[in-house]
Structure formats: structure tokens, C-alpha cells
Amino acid sequence: MKLAVLFCFILLIVLQTDCERGTRRQRRRMHQRRLRKSSSFHLRANRQLEVQQTTAAPDARLPTANSDYSVEENIESLLSNLGVESSYSVLPGKKGYCFVKGMIMYNKAVWSPEPCTTCLCSNGRVLCDETECHPKACPYTIKPEGECCPICSDAEQESINKLHKQVPPPQMEMDQVAIKEALQSEEDEEIAEGHKEHKKETSVPTKIHGDGERTERKLRPEKEGRSAHQPLYHGRREEEESKEETEREGEEEEEEEEEEEEDAIRGDVFRMSSRVIPGTPRGRPRLPRSCSLSYRTISCVHADFTEIPPITAPEVTNLELVGNSIISIPDEAFNGLPNLERLDLSRNNITSSGIGPKAFKSLKKLMRLNMDGNNLVHIPSDLPSTLEELKINDNNLQAIDEKSLSDLNQLVTLELEGNNLSEINVDPLAFQSLESLSYLRLGRNKFRIIPQGLPASTEELYLENNQIEEITEICFNHTRKITMIILRYNKIEESRIAPLAWINQENLESIDLSYNKLYHVPSYLPKSLLHLVLIGNQIDRIPGYVFGHMQPGLEYLYLSFNRLSDDGVDLVSFYGAYHSLRELFLDHNDFKSIPPGIQDMKALHFLRLNNNKIRNIHPEQICNAEEDEDSALEHLHLENNYIRTREISSYAFSCIRLYSSIVLKPQHIK
């Protein structure tokens, strides 16, 4: 019996709590509905105001007769309440047709004679209707509170009012009346709904309360026993409070979701994100004037520095000090940049005596060092062993001894162009420790022979603009990986090239001997050669079978600006290259006709014969008449010769797919 009474009492408390929560929830919903309805009612009131302003009473007019005996009838428009007098005639004698400005309009035809006017032909009568034209532009913008961007307000009604000659009532009065009516109607609805819900919610508690009064008399003797169950009651009370908190949190989440949905629907308004925009990092290093920081690079280009600026930035990996007036590098110049990987000190006035013995000691991760355009007379000592690229071009280097590059076993690129180096002041063991070197530039120096002791790992060797006269048999004995040799602008003669100088090189693919003293194409070329450049020599002959031993075969042969003539080339001159040659440059020579063998070069894509003395092109010199396949030629240059283009046979270029790839003009007239 005690448990039953206790259960009824707890149930009464729970129902009362649910009733209070439902009342609060109902008030919140009614408040939100009131806000939505007030805003929608305000918009409807504005629209009704616009319609009322544009509405005018039609004037009754009598039919009038026109000069062409047609009757003009003015009636009220069927499309709106606005009556507009029509100035269009009805076609006499044609029932159901209308005659408008010389045009016949069929029955039910609709047209617009002018903006904001629509006309209808109905059983021989012209019915016109003038509609409201909404302004295309936004005449007035407002910026709501708490928003970032302006929005367009209601369009002004002045243009419409002037059209109908009406004075609208004050906007403030209409707004106040509309708002009062909306609030009054909503309050009435809320009161009625509140009464209904209150009756439903209070019906059950009333019944329980009546039962409680009956049982109260029975419970009086048991008050003492009820106190024994107080701990149980408090425990359930705490559970109910926790449930209320969870339900309250759920309601708040629902409200937030509703607000998000409203924001998504109202997508024309921009809302600022609640997240904080990150500011400038506090760890940004202090930089001297005229310097900039980009990612991990500090750039101080042309900043008029006379010394290395003191910078402390452990996170920086690149430092550019190009184009300053720096003279010296003290021992502790880069102590604040321990993670530096690339250092550019080009175009300064740094001298060898101004570099401290421990200037680069703190740079344990330095990989690239550029010191072009300074006043160094020898390579700085104690360079980091991590260096992979070292550039000391355009200095005044006088010598390279055995220890200058001794610790740079990871060096891949070494550039020493534009100095005073020669075979006399460069020790034969200077490059011995460079085990990883693959790219070596020694151009614009004073070498007379190929430097001795080149690293075995060398792949590209640049020796242009020197005074080299001879290539001996032992020059490339230890460089079996070499793929490119550049020897242009030297003094090499074919008789001074040893037969075994490079014929056994298995990886050598490119040789540049331009602007030397060659009189014919050198013999004993490497078997692997693909690219041979002999521009600007005095070559007057291509010996037979000079390319015959090459595998897979020569692909690029450049012989421009030489002295080749018809007598210097025969059918066996290109033997071994007919199947492989892709580009052949024979321009600026002394040819008087197309060289023999051109039509047999099946892989040829680019042929230059311009600026010669060619006068005639025979049908089978470029295209073979016995073959039906098209030529692979894509570019053929024959300009600046003495060819009479009108006398060229129609079969001369029949194998070339595109005539636009043939250049014939201009020609010399003589």
C-alpha cells in the first residue's frame, strides 16, 4: 500500500513537470511563429500598398471613328483592373481580325507595342493592358546591424506614382497599422490555442488530484513510514533532474539546427564565421630593411649591404644576398641560420682574404653555394661537405690545388667559368676527390688542352671559349660515363684530334665543335653519337662512310655556315645515317643544287638549304617517284636562293603532306 501511494505521488510530480515544460515550449514556438508571421505580413502589406498605388479607375469613353472608317473601341482590360485606352484600329470587313499599324493580327493574338503594355486581339477588338514595371536597378541599399554586406531595400515608388499621378499614403502609418493588425490577430490565435492545450494538459492531473484527495485520509496514519523512503525519493529526483538537463540540451540543439536551416534558406545574406582568423605568427624573425621573407627564404637583393646582416632565423633554409657591396664574410656571419640549405652571394665584392677560416663552419646543411661575380682568387677553404652545387663563375681564380676541393665528395655540379684557369695552375689531382661530380663547366678560361684528372663520374663537360688546340688519346680515358662534350669557340683542327680520342666512348651522344678550324667532318667519331654540331667552321667536304660505324645512327647533323659545295658531298657521304637522320642543317653554304641522297632519308623531319646558290629543283631530288608513301618532312627551307618558283615541277614536292611546310620565298633575282 505504501509503494502504491508513493508511486502516485511521484507520477503527480512528473506530470506537473511535463506540463510546465510543454508550456515553455509552446510559448517559444508561438514567439517564433509570431516573428515569422509579422515579417511575412509586413511584406504582404508592402505589396498591397504597391498594387493600390498603381490601380486607377477606368474612364468610360465613347467609340470614335478614324479617318479610314474604322471604329476604335475603348473597353476595360481583361488582364487587370487598369483600363487603358487603345489607339489601334479594328480591320473593317474582317470579322475577328485586328488591324494594327498596317499589320493584321489574328484572333487571340498577343503583342507588346511598348514597354509595360500588353495587347490582345479578341473578336476584332484590341484590348490593351498596362502592367507595373519593376525597377531593374536597386535604388537604395541598407546595411542591417550585425551584417557585413549591404542588401537591396524595397524599390522606390516614385516612378510608378508619377506614371499614375497618385500620391501614396505615408509609409510609416501603413507599417504601423499593418503591424498592429498582425499582432492583434496572432494574439487572438495564441489565446485560443492556449485554452485548448491547457484543457488537454490539465485533464489528467485534475483526475489524479481528485484521487489523491480521497486517498489522503488513508495516508495520514502512514506518514511516519513514508519518511523511511526519503533516500529513494531523492535518488529518483536526481534522475529526473538529469533527464530534464539532457532534454533541455536537446531542445537547444534543435533550436540551433533550426537557425542553421533558416540561414541555409536565407542564403543571400553573408554571415561572418565564428572561427578566429589566424594572425601573423609571433615567431617571425626580425629582418633588416630592404629584406623580405617568403616561406623559408629571406631575400635581400640589391639592398646596398656592405656586410652580412645579422639574422637569427633557425627555420630559414634559403638566403639571397645578390647584388650588394659585401666585402667580407666573418667567422660568425651565419651562426643564426643553422638550417640554411641554399646561399646566394653572387654579384658582390667579396675577396678571398675577407672570408674567415670558419665562415661556413656553422652551415651543416648547406647544399648550394653561389659566389658568381666576386673577386675571389682561390676557392674558399673549409666548405661544408654537404655541398652538392658550387658556382664560382666570373671571378679571378688563379689556381686550384689538390686540397681546394678535397672534402666535397657529395658535389654534383661545379661551375668555374670566366676565370684565369689553365692546365698550368690546375693540379691534375684537383678533381680527384669529387666522386659524385657529373656536371663540370670550365668555359671562358685559358686551357690549351683538355684538363687532366677529370672525375670518372663526369657526364657533361663544358670547355667552350678556351684556347684548346689538341685532343689527345688520354683525355677521356677515365671518363667512361660522359654523354656531352662542348668544345665550341676553340682552335681545334681535325688533324690534331687523335684517332682513339673518343671512338671507344660508349655513352657519348653529343659533341659540339662549332667555330673551330675544321676543314672536313672529323673521322673516328664515337659509335654512340646522336648529335653532332659543326657550325661555323671551314668544312668543304663530308668524307664517305664517316657515319657508317654509328649505332643506332646519327640523328642531328648541323653544318650551317661552312663552305660545302656540290663537289664536297656524294652518295656515300651520309652512308649509315639514311635511316636515322632527323634534322639536317646545310644552310649558308655554297650548294648550287640539292645534295644527293636527300630523297633516301626516310626519317628526315627538318631540312635547311636556305641561303645557298641553288637554281633548280629536279622532280626526284626530294621525292622519290617510285614510292607511294609520303615523306616525313615537316619543315623544308629553300628561301634566299636563286630558284624560279614558277619553273618548279609539280612533282617536285608531291611526297610532302603539307605545302605550308615548304618555305620558298624570298628568292634572289639575278
Curated annotation (Swiss-Prot):
InterPro entries: ECM2, Leu-rich_rpt, Leu-rich_rpt_typical-subtyp, LRR_dom_sf, VWF_dom. The keyword Secreted applies. Glycans are attached at N349, N420, N477. PROSITE patterns: LRR, VWFC_1, VWFC_2. Residues 192-227 have a biased composition (Basic and acidic residues). A motif (Cell attachment site) lies at residues 266-268. Residues 1-19 form the signal peptide. Its main location: secreted. Disulfide bonds: none annotated. Gene3D superfamilies: 6.20.200.20, Ribonuclease Inhibitor (3.80.10.10). Residues 96-153 form the VWFC domain. This is Extracellular matrix protein 2. The lineage of its organism: Eukaryota, Metazoa, Chordata, Craniata, Vertebrata.
